[in-house]
Amino acid sequence: MNKQNLLSHWALPILAMLIVAVFYFFPYYQGYRFRAADQFQLEYMMYPLKEAKGQSGHLPFWAPHLFSGMPSYLIAYEAENILWKDPIYYFAKIFREYPPVILFVGLLGFFLFLWAEGLPGPLALGGAFAFVMMSYYTNMIVATHWGKSSVLFTAPYGLAGLSLLFQGRWSEGVILSLFGWAGMIGGHHPQMSYYVLFLWAAYVLFRLWEARQKRTWKPFLVATAFLGVSAGVGALSQAANLLPYYEYGQYSIRGGSELERDQTRDPALQTGLDKSYAQSYSASRAELWTLIIPDFVGGTSQEDLVKRLGRSSALYEKLKPYGPQGIAFARSAPTYWGGSPFSAGSFYAGIIPFFLIILGLVYRADPLDWTLLYTGWIVLQLSLGAYGYSLWLTPLLLLLPWLSYFLPRKYLPAPWRPWATAGLFLTGWGLISLLDNNPAESYKLTDAALEYLPFYNKFRAPSTLLVVMGFLWAWLGMRGLKRFLDEPSARRFWIGLGITALIVILVGILGGVFEWFSFEGEADEELRRQNLPEELLAALREDRITLAQRSAMQSLFWLALAGGVLLLRIRDWLKATLAAFAIAFLILLDGWLVNSRYFPRQSTYVRKTEIPLPPPPQPYETYLKTQDTAFYRILPLHTSPFTDARPSVFLENAGGYHPAKLKRYQQLIETHLSRLELPVLQMLGIKYLTANGQYAIPPTYDSLLTFPDGITLYRLRAPVRYTWLAESLVVYPRIDQTLDSLSQYDLSRYALITQKDLQLLPTQPQSAPLDSSEGVEILRRNPLEEILLRVRSRTARLLVLSEIHYPPDWKATVDGQETPIIYTNFVLRGIVVPPGEHTVRVYLQSAIHERGSRLSLIGSLLAWALAAVATGGTLWHWRKWKPPQSPS
């Protein structure tokens, strides 16, 4: 490689990626942080655990401050013995701030992937910019969804390794695969890893087809073996992260329901999420067009129409007579009309890469193109979720791209084929949409996937699948650009440009004129319920059309700029390398400007000093910390009790926030706790309630104090017990009966269990009135890891603790002899105690942590050994180095 190639193919692209990574999130280096509600919630959840670490030296595995107690693996978890790290770990030492790190890792990873696919440096740079500038990715980072972004931005390393392995470049392929799998598994987001595997599967299937066509089975099998080894070792090195997540998932709301009524209502609930919940946050059919027209469905949930449209805003003109209140509404108008409850931005993947995809297909569509196109087409259908097409139409939908491409090739002359393909595809899609215009009533592709596709029912938000389009958009786009630069053709250029412009005009500009789309969303029904006049709703709809049309015009503007660059190349006024760099710059600028509009600095960032941790205690928290040092829990009704972690910072909370809380506790909330039923409040030790007038407080809670901030503290009249001996057992054959009956008993005397749990006990507990000689003394209570009790009973009794049971971790001994803990009162811990005086120890032992640590150590050592051998192989063959080849 000569110096000029080294400069253009490596030095300049890497320098450009460094600059972009630093300046895209430059406020982080100025002392700012994202103003992200999810990040605040995470900090609130983690704070007590970090405080505990300061005292013990390690993060606890249990979080007693959330939902009466839950495992902390998905809050703050320190895996041990992971000696093989993902790329983020190493680059963090350079950039120091996480957003620039993750952005650079994504840029470099996709650059390496396209290089592995045989694309030169300038094109690989353009693909890297197209990849990271997808608006949805920026949305993830700004929302501080670090797990999602780390998986997605390390996945390209694995894809690069995959590509190199199938080219016979074992050494580089193994190293990159190891890095990729470390990031995909260690990124703590199984949903993103699962979606990325769609791409892996599609690529491997393509290579399988290629091996069959060329009869190259031996290289394919060798590459597959290397892939299996590197993927297995990379995943094994992250076992300490993976195993606790997998185990906890079986007990969380992502796992199956044990309730028979749920399984009868929806068989999928035996293993995963409820179908309606799993399909929440689906992309509407119109929303797919935001991939090329960012504001087609209204932009964000609240848009400043005064700023965006000015005097051309119909809603603003209608609201001016209403004075300041009307203007305020226009400045935060609910313009979003897509499929989700709210939106912080679009799925914009770039009009320029889309144009390059069309341009590449005008040249030809090879087998890899078809593999990627069909992967994207299936992803689009699955992302629709609740808005998807009926399953009986799915075969026709899947055939549509193939029919649209091959019918014109068979029956029409060459000049007309691209136009006919575009026309057939758009017309066919439109007709299918008209045939199936009521998706709520049909059995859809997503329903089938939830029932039959392994693990698919563990995840919600089908629109999240569109993250895969970021990979496909950039990959296919750069393949198209390479074809053009290798063989510039004015005729093909004008056809590609014309088809792309026609699609934008038909959808973005004429779609509103001819009412091909409704431009109405779920927010409109809520506004009608609030008696908003129909004339204002009509004006809002008109503004949505205007936003879509202006956004389409902006897409046409960037399309014209990209077309101008390629036209200069056609006329040989611009060299191929400079043209590729210019396209890369335009892709970057387009994405940067769109994302800056969605996430303006003034509303996206806040100074780090303005985020105090811990937050200042509220008056009721200060009062309770100083006035009551015994055991109790609170239920903060002055806020959203089950979606706010702030009250969990200083006190043990029966509520809180977590996107994957324990399944049984969620069912308890839905059935009893949200209704404030007294027996359940008492069994959970909820001594205090806080309220500000929004809830009807149970009469057994007395008003104690009203603080200056308007929060009233209520205290339970009866004493709160932490642990007790059950006088009587109520045994049910079905777990549903146990849950449903909790409100019917005095749970300080009765214990409700299932026949299945009763059979786990070594001794049958007796039902008899307690006498004065029987009782429980708390010797030590450390809810993080150990509880020590002295129990006196004259007969075998069931000891009940007001602690949430998690079977994998919590163990018990009676006088040093291990004894089982069973579910009691649906969620609590129950232990049988024989007659006499005994010492009961309840302790946390994370077997999965220990097992994962051992496996990670083995996997890490194997990874380093593989990497050392692979590095040696690379150096040995350095003199024979050849650039990677594109599979096409």
Segments from the language model and where they lie:
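Active-site-proximal, structured, solvent-exposed surfaces of multi-pass membrane proteins
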Residues: G655, R749-S888
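Transmembrane signal-anchor helices characteristic of membrane glycosylation enzymes that use polyprenol
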Residues: H9-M45, V229-P244, I378, L426-S433, ...
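Contiguous transmembrane helix-bundle modules in multi-pass membrane proteins
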Residues: A128, T144-T154, L165-A182, P190-M192, ...
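Transmembrane-helix motifs of polytopic, lipid-linked glycan transferases
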Residues: P100-G118, F355-L356, L476, G563
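Polar, glycine-rich mid-to-C-terminal structural blocks
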Residues: V222-A283
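Transmembrane-helix signature of membrane-embedded glycosylation machinery that interfaces
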Residues: F110-L119, L159-L162, F166, L361, ...
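Membrane-interface coil-to-helix junctions
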Residues: I19-F113, F129-L152, D266-I351, G385-Y389, ...
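Extracytoplasmic
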Residues: S257, R261, W573, F585, ...
